[in-house]
């Protein structure tokens, strides 16, 4: 039982770290969209960040950030990791 709980916690922590990394990417996207003068956190992903910034609006980016934050909250509240990630992934799809 204890091992099962530790395993679930490790999975949740790993997913949360990945979501924090994703938030950092969207922070960079938003910074480009609003013309911020700060440096990119994800310099290795500058091309991808630039493309996302060009292909979306700052409102879409803010909505995506909110969806990622919601996913993090649901994980902490013992949400099913697969369902949480699926819901978030659907919300992050590019808008037509």
Where are these regions (language model features)?
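Terminal low-complexity regulatory extensions
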Residues: 64-66, 90-93
